[in-house]
């Protein structure tokens, strides 16, 4: 069904959506799904300025703010942000070609396409008008940020291989391969001399418990690897046990018992590289910042990191181009999409 507008152009018949005004709040429902927003974000035809503008709002507290408050936090020009959001809304509306948002005066409204609502702010506020991103767009941006990491990683790996001499990350695959079918003590003995742990302090402590508290330590590692128990509880129990059995006599300067989450992650990864991957707090903190998520307290960071990596893992598992790209470097070693996911985060954030 078609109709002609006054200026003579022919358009597909589309829904006219009226703006809802409730006091100072302006809103409307446009029915654009998360999947549609994600497709638009991935589309190379969508201006990078539009994507950057949307992501700036995403990074604002609770994904809302005025142009001034957002730019004060993220940088940039408030007028440019306003312009890009408006132009983005116009672009999306034309791209989808199924609705028009109309103001009470009959004029089109474009900023409401990406925004769930907007409201006037009281005097002396940081700005005069506040936006709130649509929930479907928020979820799409979360997925897009993961997808974008994989795309950046593929571009990088086309130039620098995993086993490149100047930036060699192959040792991680070599380590998990060497640990296959080894007993727990042998695995820890290999882990303790790698940079996956804080070697100067952790390595001597692990060496001590292996040689002088072997039975107790082996039992502690067995409990740590028991997947029937929640990871946070296992880490807590391992930490407590290690403070008891790794207390080196006559060492009043000892302040690390090889029970930190980084050490735990390295041990677990080498025991089961398809269930765990390596962790470092600095990397975890950067990932949280990138995803606009608050880090957890000590003792819960590693389990949180493992949760945050799951969406990335799903993309990695289903990306044939990525696997074909890294295969020449790692095909002779134990395969772990979790380790590949960790490598993506490591090379892009550290």
Q: How would you describe each model-predicted region?
A:
Residues 23-43:
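Short, Lys/Arg-enriched N-terminal segment that forms or immediately precedes the first helix
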Residues 58-62, 272-274:
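Short helix-capping/hinge SLiMs at alpha-helix to coil transitions
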């Amino acid at each position: 069904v078609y109709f002609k507008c006054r200026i003579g152009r022919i358009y597909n018949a589309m829904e006219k959506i009226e703006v809802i005004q409730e006091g100072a709040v302006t809103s409307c429902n446009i029915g654009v799904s998360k999947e549609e927003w994600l497709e638009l974000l991935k589309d190379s035809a969508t201006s990078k300025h539009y994507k950057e503008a949307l992501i700036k709002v995403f990074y604002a507290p609770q994904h809302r703010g005025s142009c001034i408050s957002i730019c004060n936090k993220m940088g940039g020009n408030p007028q440019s942000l306003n312009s890009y959001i408006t132009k983005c809304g116009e672009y999306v509306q034309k791209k989808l070609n199924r609705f028009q948002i109309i103001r009470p005066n009959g004029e089109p409204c474009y900023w409401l396409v990406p925004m769930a609502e907007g409201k006037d702010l009281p005097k002396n506020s940081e700005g005069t008008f506040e936006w709130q991103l649509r929930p479907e767009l928020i979820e799409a941006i979360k997925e897009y940020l993961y997808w974008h990491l994989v795309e950046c990683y593929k571009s990088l790996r086309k130039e620098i291989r995993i086993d490149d001499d100047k930036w060699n990350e192959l040792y991680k695959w070599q380590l998990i391969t060497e640990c296959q079918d080894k007993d727990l003590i042998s695995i820890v003995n290999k882990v303790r001399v790698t940079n996956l742990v804080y070697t100067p302090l952790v390595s001597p402590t692990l060496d001590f418990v292996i040689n002088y508290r072997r039975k107790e330590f082996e039992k502690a590692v067995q409990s740590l690897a028991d997947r029937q128990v929640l990871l946070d509880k296992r880490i807590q129990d391992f930490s407590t046990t290690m403070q008891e059995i790794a207390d080196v006599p006559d060492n009043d300067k000892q302040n690390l018992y090889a029970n930190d989450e980084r050490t735990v992650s390295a041990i677990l990864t080498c025991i089961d590289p398809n269930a765990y991957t390596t962790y470092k707090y600095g990397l975890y903190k950067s990932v949280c910042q990138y995803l606009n998520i608050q880090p957890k307290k000590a003792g819960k960071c590693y389990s949180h990191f493992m949760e945050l990596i799951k969406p990335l893992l799903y993309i990695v598992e289903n990306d044939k181009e990525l696997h074909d790209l890294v295969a020449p470097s790692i095909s002779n070693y134990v395969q772990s999409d979790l380790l590949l996911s960790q490598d993506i985060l490591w090379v892009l954030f550290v």
